[in-house]
């Protein structure tokens, strides 16, 4: 905590304005590294793990410490992004007038007699160039083959070969402006299968707003130093042909850091998995000692596996704990192999990892205290202390769950003269399409209008919910309803539309189109309801898979939702709600 919150944060202000010399970064890193390994004045300490590995993310087996050079560049990239996106700020106007009056920051050059501040910001130009991406609105400002506009962090630019006469075409040429949707056939004709799917996954708004440059490193399209830092680290990996841990190892490391135990024990488990504990076997490997025999039982080399499971003292502790591993140990294993097996059995034995690792922690503390001259403790004491650690942690971190009163589990009628519209979406992955379903009812529960619509767009669940809501708002207006409650079973969409959270960059055109309609209505409200209270909308959205384009019902109840609507009304009439 001290390293991340203090030592690595102290130079942040300076690093956000200027590029620190590499030697200074190395000196700061050296001091931080020595502090971590406990070095004091005139005292040497062994660095068990390289600092490069310590700076890897926790999910990749590191400690998540910052690499100061990369962090410095990420902070400078923030200034570069401000020059790129905030053209009207005083900071941007001054630098633009002096260094790139006729171009953008990503196209600027160092120029003659540049200031140190400009040199520093320019060192992060490549980061800004790599991270910027166009968010498609109407597509009129985006070149199909020369601009980055695909929603992909790895390949945001079209790689499919040019097809004459499309070399200089713009994204707007792929959009059916009358329908506010992609020209599905044209997209499939021009691009590869995977790229066509990516294009069709971009939600379009019926209002077709202007295109905008966003940051590709975050879902909301806003620059963050954290995302820029990770981008820089990935760029460094690619240049050195390094490989990150595979998905299984990531799962293991994540499981370790999610243990419901104090941080000191999680760090201990991480060190044990990295073979960074000062066991006699590890010390012998580093030629610090010649003897690796276990000092407690004298029956074998003191490896982590021997110390925690095969040593006579460890066996006595485990016997008193009445806990047993749900698998057989192999003498050739290391500590990380045991952890991996425990992770595999965590679903069938919940809480077992926490209990076992807290007991390993007590065994390790006991071993160290005995080596330092303290008296031995009984095994029962170690077991009791380990159990107390788990209980105290759980008690301190117990969460009280409050039921959210803002949504209902069943449908209930609106107050007259208002109306209620249930809206839902369905994603048809096999057809690379989505369905929108909506039904509007009055205070008596009578169906006044309903619609289901199939859209050839390969959208995510949230994008599909937002697109359905946009269609629903326009449909309600066209049908003449001016006071409407719009109900959705997507809490994320409800939070976005009510201002409780920000929309992802890809959704901005759609949510902006929805919110632009608010002034037209005398009353409008967006509410969350659970799936049980949204059954008619859900059924219609699913039914859209069977229709060619759209089906509308006016002043009649569609047969497929008649039972669901009747059940909603009957529950209301009998006062269940």
Task: Identify the function of each model-found stretch.
Residues 1-577:
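A helix-boundary/hinge signal
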């Amino acid at each position: 905590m001290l390293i991340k919150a203090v030592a690595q944060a102290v130079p942040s202000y300076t690093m956000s304005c200027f590029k620190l010399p590499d030697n200074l970064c190395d000196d700061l890193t050296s001091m931080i590294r020595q502090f971590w390994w406990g070095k004091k004045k005139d005292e040497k300490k062994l660095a068990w793990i390289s600092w490069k590995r310590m700076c890897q993310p926790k999910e990749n087996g590191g400690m998540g410490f910052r690499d100061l050079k990369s962090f410095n560049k990420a902070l400078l990239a923030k200034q570069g992004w401000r020059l790129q996106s905030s053209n009207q700020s005083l900071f941007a106007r001054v630098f633009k007038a002096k260094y790139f009056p006729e171009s953008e920051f990503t196209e600027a050059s160092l120029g003659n007699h540049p200031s140190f501040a400009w040199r520093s910001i320019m060192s992060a130009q490549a980061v800004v160039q790599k991270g910027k991406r166009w968010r498609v609105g109407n597509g009129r400002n985006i070149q199909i083959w020369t601009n980055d506009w695909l929603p992909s962090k790895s390949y945001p630019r079209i790689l499919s070969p040019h097809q004459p006469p499309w070399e200089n075409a713009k994204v707007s040429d792929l959009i059916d402006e009358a329908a506010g949707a992609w020209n599905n056939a044209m997209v499939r004709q021009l691009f590869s299968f995977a790229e066509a799917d990516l294009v069709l996954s971009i939600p379009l708004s019926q209002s077709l707003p202007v295109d905008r440059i966003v940051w590709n490193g975050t879902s909301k399209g806003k620059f963050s130093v954290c995302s820029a830092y990770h981008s820089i680290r990935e760029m460094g990996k690619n240049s050195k042909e390094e490989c990150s841990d595979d998905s299984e190892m990531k799962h293991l490391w994540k499981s370790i850091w999610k243990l419901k135990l104090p941080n000191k024990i999680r760090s201990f488990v991480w060190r044990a998995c990295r073979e960074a504990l000062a066991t006699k076997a590890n010390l012998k490997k580093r030629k610090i000692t010649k003897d690796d025999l276990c000092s407690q039982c004298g029956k074998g080399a003191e490896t982590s596996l021997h110390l925690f499971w095969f040593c006579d003292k460890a066996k006595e502790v485990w016997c008193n704990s009445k806990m047993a591993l749900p698998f057989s140990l192999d003498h050739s294993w290391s500590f990380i192999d045991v952890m991996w097996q425990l992770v595999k059995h965590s679903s069938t034995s919940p809480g077992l990892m926490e209990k076992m690792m807290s007991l390993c922690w007590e065994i390790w503390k006991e071993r160290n205290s005995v080596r330092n001259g303290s008296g031995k403790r009984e095994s029962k004491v170690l077991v009791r202390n380990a159990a107390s650690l788990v209980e105290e942690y759980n008690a301190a971190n117990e969460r009280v769950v409050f039921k959210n009163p803002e949504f209902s589990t069943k449908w209930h009628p609106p107050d007259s003269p208002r109306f209620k519209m249930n809206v839902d979406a369905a994603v048809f992955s096999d057809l690379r399409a989505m369905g929108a379903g909506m039904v509007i009812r009055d205070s008596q529960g009578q169906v006044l209008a309903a619609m289901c619509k199939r859209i050839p767009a390969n959208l995510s669940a949230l994008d599909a919910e937002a697109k359905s809501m946009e269609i629903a708002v326009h449909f309600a207006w066209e049908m003449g309803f001016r006071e409407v409650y719009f109900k959705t079973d997507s809490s994320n969409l409800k939070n976005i539309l009510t201002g409780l959270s920000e929309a992802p960059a890809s959704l901005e055109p759609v949510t902006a189109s929805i919110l632009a309609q608010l002034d037209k209505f005398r009353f409008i409200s967006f509410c969350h309801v659970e799936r049980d209270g949204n059954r008619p909308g859900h059924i219609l959205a699913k039914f859209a898979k069977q229709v060619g384009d759209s089906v509308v019902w006016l002043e009649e109840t569609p047969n497929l939702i008649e039972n669901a609507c009747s059940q909603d009304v009957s529950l209301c009439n009998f006062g269940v709600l």
